[in-house]
């Protein structure tokens, strides 16, 4: 199936008071994400991947070892990453964390505060472009990971519960070179914890 750019689940200016400006979403969603969709569709046309789901393409082309596959993987994975990213955020000043998620984070990391600290450290410590993730491993354990470029948890058989884009285009308009501040703001103000909990 062809890649399609999903509509944002909120208005472009809905997150502005929470630290993600209308301008950032216009560039990030309408231009960057759209480019992954458009390029991905061009690259899969006439290949074995045409008609496959994004998830199948990501898993099938990761570490495929062929240069011809790398462009397909990069665009498919970044399309998938961004589609999740928009859903993992939401408007509203007081976003409650569901009890089951809070309990799981405390059991896995000691406290919600420690989870946030470790997640932000993973994102800040990712050299160059990439993503920070909270994942559920195949054994059900919750883990914090970071990946380079467009690599995502699908590549490792993990379930993505939360992901934060740490490519510079995701934060430079609003935070300039202050990636740690962007990550802290993401965790404290932007995350839709109901969505995260629904992925468990």
Swiss-Prot record:
Family label: Belongs to the iron/manganese superoxide dismutase family.
Residue sites binding Fe cation per the record: 28, 82, 165, 169
Record gene name: sodB
Details of cofactor binding: Binds 1 Fe cation per subunit.
Organism of provenance: Rhodobacter capsulatus (Rhodopseudomonas capsulata)
UniProt keyword annotation of Iron present: yes
Enzyme nomenclature, EC number: 1.15.1.1
GO molecular function ontology, one term from the record: superoxide dismutase activity
Role this protein plays: Destroys superoxide anion radicals which are normally produced within the cells and which are toxic to biological systems.
Domain of life: Bacteria
A Pfam family it matches: Sod_Fe_C
Subunit-level organization: Homodimer.
Catalytic activity as recorded in UniProt: 2 superoxide + 2 H(+) = H2O2 + O2
Keywords: Iron, Metal-binding, Oxidoreductase
Full protein name: Superoxide dismutase [Fe]
SUPFAM superfamilies for the chain: Fe,Mn superoxide dismutase (SOD), C-terminal domain, Fe,Mn superoxide dismutase (SOD), N-terminal domain
Calcium recorded as keyword: no
Xref: PANTHER family: SUPEROXIDE DISMUTASE, SUPEROXIDE DISMUTASE [FE] 2, CHLOROPLASTIC
Cofactor: Fe cation
């Amino acid at each position: 199936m062809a890649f399609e750019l999903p509509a944002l689940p909120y208005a472009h200016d809905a997150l502005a008071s929470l630290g993600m400006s209308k301008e950032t979403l216009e560039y990030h969603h309408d231009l960057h994400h759209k480019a992954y969709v458009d390029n991905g569709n061009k690259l899969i046309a006439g290949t074995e991947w045409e008609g496959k789901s994004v998830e199948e393409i990501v898993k099938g082309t990761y570490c495929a070892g062929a240069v011809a596959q790398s462009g397909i993987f990069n665009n498919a994975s970044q399309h998938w990453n961004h589609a999740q990213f928009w859903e993992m955020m939401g408007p509203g000043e007081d976003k409650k964390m569901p009890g089951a998620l809070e309990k799981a984070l405390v059991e896995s990391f000691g406290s919600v505060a420690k989870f946030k600290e470790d997640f932000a450290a993973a994102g800040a410590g990712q050299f160059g472009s990439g993503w920070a993730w909270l994942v559920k491993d195949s054994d059900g354990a919750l883990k914090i990971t970071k990946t380079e470029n467009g690599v995502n948890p699908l590549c490792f058989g993990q379930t993505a519960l939360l992901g934060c884009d740490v490519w510079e285009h995701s934060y430079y308009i609003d935070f300039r070179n202050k990636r740690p501040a962007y990550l802290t703001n993401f965790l404290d103000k932007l995350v839709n914890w109901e969505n995260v909990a629904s992925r468990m």
